[in-house]
Design a protein with these regions (language model features):
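Short amphipathic
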Residues: 15-22, 168-170, 307-317
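Functional cores that coordinate and move charged inorganic groups
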Residues: 93, 113-231
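Hydrophobic helix-and-loop "lid/oligomerization" segment in the mid-to-C-terminal part
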Residues: 257-344, 350, 354
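Conserved nucleotide-binding/hydrolysis modules and their immediate coupling elements
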Residues: 1-83
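Glycine-rich, acidic loop segments that terminate in or are immediately followed by a histidine
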Residues: 45, 199-219, 310-408
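A generic structural motif
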Residues: 30-32, 65-75, 129-134, 347-349, ...
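Active/ligand-binding-proximal structured segments within catalytic/core domains
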Residues: 37-53, 79-132, 376-377
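A conserved active-site cap/scaffold subdomain adjacent to cofactor or substrate pockets
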Residues: 213-214, 218-272
Length: 408
């Protein structure tokens, strides 16, 4: 028994009624098998349709040896063999998948026709799609440059603007399918579906595919490449198509508009004003760096002059890295213990040439709801509030004074 795939007859069909053939249960859930289905099962790099069956969510669909399994989100299955069920797919997801998958064909065809680039891998992710393009050794191209990607993107969108017909032909024999100008060699011998964009004699693309596609390229809407990166001996192209690309455009436009408002710039001079602002920020950052270096040097000298064996300094403007730098500069000059407190984060750094700083933190921080660790020469402890941090310092100081009779 094979499940009849209604989407092969009409990809725009959103619902149907079917007869339940069997119910399957395992540790992962409950599944039903029906005589026909409107749901597309996972395959060909495309995720499955989701939707409902008599109001019950259908969360996963796959095909095995011609039989389609529908996973339903329920513990007690209301269906039984012989009963009928009404199926409804999530149409928005179907459209996204149709636009995305057909967009992949269009873009792959563009890379192939322009650069003899072969699609060796395809992934439809939640946030973007990717194709892995391998260039022929005799293509004359060593890599896919930004300019090449822009040219392929333009060619792909020109195919969309031409609103070419998208036809799907089914073949039972490999030899019959191979009469078409295929972009890619066939991987199987029977039950072959070939998707062709445009004229079969000179198509924009022609390749085997089991996915769902719109009836014309114009329904894809738009294709946008985001980036190209090296991936082993290929080039991975990140892109989007259709509504997903449009939503990304909207988001990017909103970001650019907000940046323009903040910089009092239009789109024409936004980059120029940003670079000016960046130059100013770099100058301020450089000044801050040198000022902090000077403060760290002065603090190091002041602490070194402090005659107390237990020393504690508090800071709100310097960073933890700055405090760590002070402690390192004083290495070899700390007879007992130095506390450096970073007030914004309720963190204390411990430095010593003679005490086990890590041991002091490990043995005492938890007594005051703190946590931390470190080595013998330096450690840090973090607390939820300033009061707990101060109690920790007082406790450790008293402990050391008792151990070394510093109070005498």
């Amino acid at each position: 028994m094979h499940t009849k795939l209604l989407f092969k007859e009409n990809v725009y069909l959103r619902s149907c009624r079917a007869t339940i053939i069997d119910i399957v249960r395992d540790k992962k859930g409950v599944y039903f098998i029906s005589d026909q289905t409107v749901f597309f099962p996972t395959g060909g790099g495309q995720s499955c349709d989701v939707g409902e069956a008599d109001g019950i969510p259908v969360t996963d669909v796959w095909e095995e040896e011609g039989v389609v399994y529908h996973r339903i989100d329920t513990d007690t299955c209301p269906f039984s063999p012989g009963s009928t069920v009404s199926m409804q797919i999530d149409w928005h997801l179907r459209i996204d998948n149709m636009q995305g998958h057909c967009g992949e064909h269009v873009l792959s065809g563009a890379f192939y026709s322009l650069y003899r680039g072969h699609n060796r891998g395809f992934h439809m992710g939640k946030d973007y799609m990717t194709i892995d393009i391998a260039l022929d050794e005799d293509s004359g191209f060593q890599k896919i440059t930004d300019d090449m990607a822009r040219e392929a993107e333009l060619r792909a969108n020109e195919v969309i603007w031409a609103d070419l017909p998208v036809s799907v032909h089914h073949f039972n024999r490999r030899s019959d399918a191979e009469e078409l100008p295929l972009r890619k060699a066939l991987a199987f011998d029977t039950d072959i579906s070939i998707v062709t964009l445009g004229d079969e004699n000179a198509p924009a693309d022609c390749v085997a595919c089991c996915g769902t596609h719109p009836s014309s390229s114009g329904q894809i809407g738009i294709i946008k490449i985001y980036k190209v990166e090296k991936n082993k001996d290929m080039f991975r192209v990140y892109f989007e198509a259709g509504k997903r690309a449009f939503r990304q455009y909207q988001h990017q436009f909103d970001v650019i508009t907000e940046l323009g408002n903040r910089l009092s710039a239009g789109t024409d001079d936004l980059l120029k004003k940003f670079l000016v602002q960046q130059k100013k920020s770099d100058a301020v950052r450089d000044q801050l760096y040198h000022l902090k270096k000077e403060i760290v040097a002065r603090e190091t000298v002041e602490i070194e002059k402090d005659p107390n064996l237990l020393r504690c300094r508090r800071y709100s403007e310097l960073s933890l890295d700055d405090l760590n730098e002070i402690g390192k500069k004083l290495s070899g000059k700390i007879d007992v213990l130095l506390f450096l407190v970073h007030q914004p984060t309720c963190t204390v750094l411990l430095f010593s040439d003679t005490c086990d700083c890590g041991g002091l933190v490990k043995g005492n921080a938890r007594l005051f709801n703190g946590k931390g660790g470190g080595s013998k020469k330096n450690a840090r402890a973090v607390f939820t509030e300033a009061e707990s941090l101060q109690r920790f310092i007082d406790h450790v100081s008293s402990q050391l004074q008792a151990d070394t009779a510093l109070g005498d």
